[in-house]
């Protein structure tokens, strides 16, 4: 007879620690922070994926700060407004005036990839590109925070009272594109973001294979269920790391024209099908393949596709049913009754499948309805998709339980679209926070808005619930504008262009890069040198002879310098 197994005390202790941590995670999830969050996994799943060495992350402090900031704006009907930062100079200047920082994948793609190979925003750069930029900026934030503390603690109380304190540690929200692949790629990307300093991450519902900038053509969506998997993967990774990183779900459904698959019934009502029975059995992909086999290329293939699409009379299934009802010989009252019945059964929030839709259509007497969503599929196999604000709302409803903010990408700054989206979201998820891209891809002057309306745009949509608003590429455009205009003037007028455009403007506006040695932290590291060497150093960078002393004096345009009769520089008496 086998001896009974006696559980060693070490095993019991291990299980005790595990169960205690599970209870801790469950209590964390029950907090106000996660009251709207749905998870398809358990606290035990999360703890099982953790190692035994507990770690903490500085980005988590900023994530909690970001949450408080956004919830305050939401409660007040205001918005955190920010833009894409390119470098440490921009991020430190932004800290004086804005309460969040954005890191754009577009800007990284064009100016700072891991391989240093620039290109358009196709998310084809290495997946550590944006996390690397986040770290670049986060290190700068921490450095300037340390530098400021050293400077302030070197002042008297009176001096500190007169010197504004700058919060350099503004939370960073970063571009996670599509998650860069499958579930494990998304998990690893999110881990990198947390480690590198991101307080928030946004992930979009485009296909990772065909990903485009939100304002390019040819966007392909993934199924609603696939994007939910991405969001769940991100949340799971944050939970495993024990962080409260903000998760933003973006949808490109407004302008998308294609979708990878018809596997999710929530997408069915927006997929287009051919309604011309003369094309039965004559798919677009087949027609193009035959044309290519016959030697046709380029413009000929495009003309063939355009002709086929025109003949197909593409419609959603609901449009097909509606048109069929209106074309029957029934009385107007009977048509109206059938239309009302159809709309009652097929309203957007019900997300009926195509199979369910066909059953309802047959009950309404439409038994031989021709509608085929496979015929117009592209050569790559994608289905045709009818993008709209309503499509974005339906996706927003599905994403909201798995994200902290919902972002609808748009093609223009349209107040009506914003209002429709906000009302649609709030009808199902009234507490969900919304985000808006104040894109520089929009020609704002062509929007029809007056200057006053442009000025009021941010606060107006903030009152609708868009509590985080950002100009993705303002850092890029500001950089280009300043350098282009200065370079042109410098080529023409030399040093006067620099003095007038840069140095005097820095002085007049109190920009701290005027004293760039101090801004870069020379004083801070002098403190290190002196501390190491007992309080004195003959090699201190900011010691006697540093030219930055010139900026401490009161210079005037008239009294600073003048030229003698022989053209020699004569220093004003105040400097002698």
Curated annotation (Swiss-Prot):
Keyword Magnesium among record annotations:
yes
Query: Which top class of enzyme applies to this chain?
Result: lyase
Which keywords does this chain's UniProt record carry?
A: Glyoxylate bypass, Glyoxysome, Lyase, Magnesium, Metal-binding, Peroxisome, Tricarboxylic acid cycle
List, alphabetically, the Pfam families matched. Answer: ICL
Q: What is its EC number?
A: 4.1.3.1
Q: Where does substrate bind?
A: 104-106, 214-215, 250, 437-441, 472
Q: Where is this motif: Microbody targeting signal?
A: 574-576
List the active-site residues: 213
Subcellular location(s): the record lists: Glyoxysome
Tell me, what is an example of a GO biological process annotation in this record? tricarboxylic acid cycle
The protein's predominant localisation is other
Instruction: Tell whether Ribosomal protein is among the UniProt keywords.
Output: no
User: Which positions are annotated as binding Mg(2+)?
Assistant: 175
For this protein, what reaction is catalysed? D-threo-isocitrate = glyoxylate + succinate
Look up the record and report any one GO term of the cellular component aspect: glyoxysome
Pathway membership, UniProt = Carbohydrate metabolism; glyoxylate cycle; (S)-malate from isocitrate: step 1/2
Record note on quaternary structure? Homotetramer.
Query: Could you say which protein family the record assigns here?
Result: Belongs to the isocitrate lyase/PEP mutase superfamily. Isocitrate lyase family.
PANTHER family for this protein: BIFUNCTIONAL GLYOXYLATE CYCLE PROTEIN, ISOCITRATE LYASE/MALATE SYNTHASE
What this protein is reported to do is described as: Involved in storage lipid mobilization during the growth of higher plant seedling.
Q: What is this protein called?
A: Isocitrate lyase
Q: What species was this sequence derived from? A: Cucumis sativus (Cucumber)
The lineage, from the top, is:
Eukaryota, Viridiplantae, Streptophyta, Embryophyta, Tracheophyta
